[in-house]
């Protein structure tokens, strides 16, 4: 008799995705982040669900309800901080996952890559709306500044902003709709993640060499299941270290002050994972130009397959491209630092140079390096 996991309609799907899936024998720990993102998503949905049971999306009580969760709800503080720091872990895993894709040429799986970019946008939108919910100073002013960017759109801008606000400023209507969207989006993300996986399993995984691994496959279980469990344990270890020892390390102290439309904080800045994009936005003096640069800084990922001019898929055997890749990483770290600094003398020019460098590296320098490496192969 055939094993039930290979015949049962539901178990068959799980079996083909996580048990008998043929996987390359040489994928490194950089391939762990997909499963870690899945764990992060489930964790965020569960902690978010329990937070939603006690949260009220009304401007008068939102801040108090978060305080109530932390002080009066059994283990509410740990749920709240797991959710807040879980978002940070989510983005760390996302950036590593995207970086892996760029380094090893995984973007050549077009459908998988494009769904991934959509997933990135959806996750960023969810995180932004979630940051507004506690209704602290940075929540309110962050929402005001970022939604206001839409007013840069010619002709329909102002109407669009007021439509999103549900009034003439960020208020009760805005908070309520943001809560509704923040609740529904993770489930859409989950559905998209399944499509992401579906497309990936059409082609099979890439591997560090970028060469077809059809000649040497191993079953996903037990090899990669045990590897994923190790990754998950490390993820939970880091998350719980953050939650239990320094829960507010990555937060903003201003968010412990209730939202006040009459008092603007001296430095409005988003959560750390948006700072690189925020720095690019601020480095362009023109409002519309800044908004376009902000969107393009992430949308540029869609162009990666077009910008791939190398005869080799992976960067494993391409030293010049490797060097440029790590310069790009350093550049993004620089932008992240600049995004959190005030808009004054040394920081403005550093931000502008780092922004130019970012687009220059991706659009010009890396494709040029690829062609140079192609020619070096002929020698």
Swiss-Prot record:
Annotated a ubiquinone binding sites: 201
Sample GO molecular function, one term: ubiquinol-cytochrome-c reductase activity
One Pfam short name: Cytochrom_B_C
Membrane-topology descriptor: Multi-pass membrane protein
Biological process annotations from GO: mitochondrial electron transport, ubiquinol to cytochrome c
Subcellular location: Mitochondrion inner membrane
Cofactor binding, note field: Binds 2 heme b groups non-covalently.
SUPFAM superfamilies documented for this protein: a domain/subunit of cytochrome bc1 complex (Ubiquinol-cytochrome c reductase), Transmembrane di-heme cytochromes
Annotated Gene3D superfamilies: Cytochrome Bc1 Complex, Chain C
Chief site of localization: mitochondrion
Binding-site residues, heme b b562: 83, 182
Keywords: Electron transport, Heme, Iron, Membrane, Metal-binding, Mitochondrion, Mitochondrion inner membrane, Respiratory chain, Transmembrane, Transmembrane helix, Transport, Ubiquinone
Positions contributing to heme b b566 binding: 97, 196
Cellular component annotations (GO), alphabetically ordered: mitochondrial inner membrane; respiratory chain complex III
InterPro entries for this protein: Cyt_b/b6_C (IPR005798), Cyt_b/b6_C_sf (IPR036150), Cyt_b/b6_N (IPR005797), Cytb/b6-like_sf (IPR027387), Cytochrome_b (IPR030689), Cytochrome_b_C_euk/bac (IPR048260), Cytochrome_b_N_euk/bac (IPR048259), Di-haem_cyt_TM (IPR016174)
Cofactor: heme b
Disulfide-bonded cysteines: none
Record-annotated membrane-spanning stretches: 33-53, 77-98, 113-133, 178-198, 226-246, 288-308, 320-340, 347-367
Function (record text): Component of the ubiquinol-cytochrome c reductase complex (complex III or cytochrome b-c1 complex) that is part of the mitochondrial respiratory chain. The b-c1 complex mediates electron transfer from ubiquinol to cytochrome c. Contributes to the generation of a proton gradient across the mitochondrial membrane that is then used for ATP synthesis.
Assembly and oligomerization: The cytochrome bc1 complex contains 11 subunits: 3 respiratory subunits (MT-CYB, CYC1 and UQCRFS1), 2 core proteins (UQCRC1 and UQCRC2) and 6 low-molecular weight proteins (UQCRH/QCR6, UQCRB/QCR7, UQCRQ/QCR8, UQCR10/QCR9, UQCR11/QCR10 and a cleavage product of UQCRFS1). This cytochrome bc1 complex then forms a dimer.
Family statement drawn from the similarity comment of this UniProt entry: Belongs to the cytochrome b family.
Name of protein: Cytochrome b
Underlying gene: MT-CYB
């Amino acid at each position: 008799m055939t094993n039930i996991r290979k015949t049962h309609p539901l178990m068959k799907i799980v079996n083909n995705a996580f048990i008998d899936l043929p996987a390359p024998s040489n994928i490194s720990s950089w391939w762990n982040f997909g499963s870690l993102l899945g764990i992060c998503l489930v964790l965020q949905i569960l902690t978010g669900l329990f937070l939603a049971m006690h949260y009220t999306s009304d401007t008068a009580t939102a801040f108090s309800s978060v305080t109530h969760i932390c002080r009066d709800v059994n283990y509410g503080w740990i749920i709240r901080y797991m959710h807040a720091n879980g978002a940070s872990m989510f983005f760390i895993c996302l950036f590593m996952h995207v970086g892996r894709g760029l380094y090893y040429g995984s973007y050549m799986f077009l459908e998988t890559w494009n769904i991934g970019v959509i997933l990135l946008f959806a996750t960023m939108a969810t995180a932004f709306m979630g940051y507004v919910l506690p209704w602290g100073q940075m929540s309110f002013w962050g929402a005001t500044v970022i939604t206001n960017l839409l007013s840069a759109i010619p002709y329909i801008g102002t109407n669009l902003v007021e439509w999103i606000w549900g009034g003439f400023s960020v208020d009760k209507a805005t908070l309520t709709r943001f809560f509704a969207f923040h609740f529904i989006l993770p489930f859409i993300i989950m559905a998209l993640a399944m499509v992401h996986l579906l497309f990936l399993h059409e082609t099979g995984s890439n591997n560090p060499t970028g060469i077809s691994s059809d000649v040497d496959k191993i079953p996903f279980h037990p090899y990669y299941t045990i590897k994923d469990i190790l990754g998950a344990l490390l993820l939970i270890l880091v998350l719980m270290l953050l939650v239990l020892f320094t829960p507010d390390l990555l937060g903003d102290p201003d968010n412990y002050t209730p939202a006040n439309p009459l008092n603007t904080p001296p430095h409005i800045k988003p959560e750390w994972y948006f700072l690189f994009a925020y720095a690019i936005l601020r480095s362009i003096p023109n409002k519309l130009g800044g908004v376009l640069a902000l969107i393009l800084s992430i949308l540029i990922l869609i162009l990666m397959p077009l910008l791939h001019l190398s005869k080799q898929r992976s960067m494993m055997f391409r030293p010049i491209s490797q060097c440029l890749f790590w310069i790009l990483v350093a550049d993004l770290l620089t932008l992240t630092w600049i995004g959190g600094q005030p808009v004054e003398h040394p920081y403005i020019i550093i931000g502008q140079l780092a922004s130019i460098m970012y687009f220059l590296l991706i659009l010009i320098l890396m494709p040029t390096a690829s062609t140079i490496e192609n020619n070096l192969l002929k020698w």
